[in-house]
């Protein structure tokens, strides 16, 4: 055996501990099991997938485009649809939407068709969720979107729709706990160049009252419910994908001039001034506010007429309830007087029959619809005041020569 052969095993034996040294250094650099568990626990707490309260809404740009298009195509009828997304630590991520069928009923047929349309919407939503799951798309309903015109949007159909979405999520096992969100898009402001998108959620007191199903006077007093605290507004932010941002940048940036070895002169720039791909909008300087004011005033008057009719119905039911209660109280007082007279004579008292079987005492009328109509009147009046104030400012500016 040569000397080189005898030296090779020794050098190999000396070089063998190197991997062990590298592994030891890697173990020393790696965190311990306790530290890793603490890091995992902190990460889970930071990314809580199910929170108690929705604090903000993050809306995808494509979903917003679908909402705006549906509301514009359905006008003058109101458009509604379902929101799909996920709750991430109190922030509701809305990634997709789909429209709900519009029954197209008139105001006179609203009471007769309300229950059937609600069932149809629930069945349609269930079928859409099932089909979306079949194609591995987002299929987690988290709320509704509603299109409105001139600010009035709160009605019983919206409340029933939120309750139906909440029941659907709870049935599927997601445990929403009444966290349905309502996205409202005002088409009137969008037509003027100001896209208005607001998000609301039901207040806890209204959720408790809705679970009990009682909205009479005493229930509203106990839960401290008015039209102003039925919904709680939450902030909305818009999120665009990188491709959408690139597309918007391409259509809003003026096209670059062609290659030229000669620098453009001042006369060329004056003859062909650079212009943006999107023309500037001067909608805010338009003085033709008469159609908008007329529409706002007409909408406010219509809602006031509906509220007057609803108040008349509630008043009639309240008077009928008072008459039946007065008859029942008179019957009980007469029976008690007769029994007192019989006891004074030493006779056995007569049994008192149930007044609910003798008299048709109706239930106390619900004041939910009247409260919602008050909210619509408030929204329409605010919108009318804003439009009138804008018109006064523009007319004053035109009078002084500023415009």
From Swiss-Prot:
Q: What subcellular compartments does it reside in? A: Cytoplasm
Primary subcellular site in the record, as a coarse category: cytoplasm
Entry's Gene Ontology molecular function annotations = metallopeptidase activity; translation initiation factor activity
**GO term, biological process aspect, one:** formation of cytoplasmic translation initiation complex
- Tell me which UniProt keywords the record has, alphabetically: Cytoplasm, Initiation factor, Protein biosynthesis
The answer to whether the entry has keyword S-adenosyl-L-methionine is no
- Pull one GO CC term from this UniProt entry: eukaryotic 43S preinitiation complex
Q: What are the start and end residues of every segment in region (Disordered)? A: 99-122
- Which segments cross the bilayer? none
Q: Which CDD domains match?
A: MPN_eIF3h
Q: Does the keyword Cytoplasm apply?
A: yes
Q: Which residues form the MPN domain?
A: 57-206
Fill in the subunit field for this protein: Component of the eukaryotic translation initiation factor 3 (eIF-3) complex.
> What HAMAP family does the database record attribute to this sequence?
eIF3h
The record's comment on protein family reads: Belongs to the eIF-3 subunit H family.
Q: What is this protein called?
A: Eukaryotic translation initiation factor 3 subunit H
User: What is the species of this protein?
Assistant: Mycosarcoma maydis (Corn smut fungus)
